Regions:
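Juxtamembrane regions of bacterial inner-membrane/periplasmic proteins
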Residues: 1-216
Length: 216
């Protein structure tokens, strides 16, 4: 029928357009792909420059997610081994095995499926990310794109949404709370699981003390 033909033509046209975009995308440099991914996730109004983000927000994130961030490359083999041991002893997820760089590329480019193929892609992209960007730049990208729950993406939305303040005015306690959330934003929702969120916040602060980032 005519309608059937129209549908087929539409599908073919869409597939042709998609294939053209795929070809164009493959021709882009890695940095151009990163810029596109950031553009899709962060507006100019919500992007927070590195020098505006409190040092305690950066320290809190590193303390709980990737304590050797400035000492290792894109992949932290020692960190993965340590995380497995620490989590087993604690009986809970105290440390993650993925580096901040790995988490960033996963958020920007990959699905949430935990497969060997995806982990391999994550590792390759993380290595490429650290080839083109500094640790400080990667940390800034992470803090501007990570999901904090309640449809808050990035530290600006989270600071305003949870605390009614700007990122630059976040207190140490608020920085620790925000660093606690990306691990499990739905479960650690401060509105529905305040006790769990506070416990994770306390853990962040303890990690910061243990690593000499703050005094007790």
């Amino acid at each position: 029928s005519k309608a059937h033909t129209t549908v087929e033509q539409t599908i073919e046209k869409n597939e042709d357009t998609l294939s053209r975009w795929e070809r164009i995308y493959r021709m882009l440099t890695f940095k151009e792909k990163v810029e596109i991914a950031l553009y899709q996730r962060v507006s100019k109004d919500t992007w927070v420059k590195s020098d505006v983000i409190p040092d305690n927000a950066k320290r809190a994130l590193i303390a709980i997610e990737d304590k050797r961030y400035y000492k290792h490359g894109a992949i932290d083999v020692l960190g993965v081994s340590r995380a497995l041991y620490v989590n087993a002893v604690a009986g809970e997820t105290v440390e993650g095995g993925s580096t901040i760089t790995q988490q960033l590329v996963k958020n920007l480019f990959l699905s949430s499926k935990r497969t060997m193929t995806r982990k391999a892609e994550e590792a390759i992209l993380a290595i490429e990310m650290e080839h083109y960007y500094s640790k400080d730049e990667i940390l800034t990208m992470y803090l501007n794109t990570v999901y904090y729950g309640h449809n808050f993406y990035g530290i600006k939305e989270a600071a305003e949404g949870y605390f009614g303040t700007s990122p630059s005015r976040l207190t140490l306690g608020q920085c620790a709370m925000l660093a606690a959330l990306p691990n499990a934003p739905s479960y650690l929702d401060p509105y529905t699981n305040y006790k769990g969120a506070k416990a994770r916040q306390k853990l962040v602060l303890e990690q910061m003390v243990d690593q000499g980032m703050i005094t007790q």
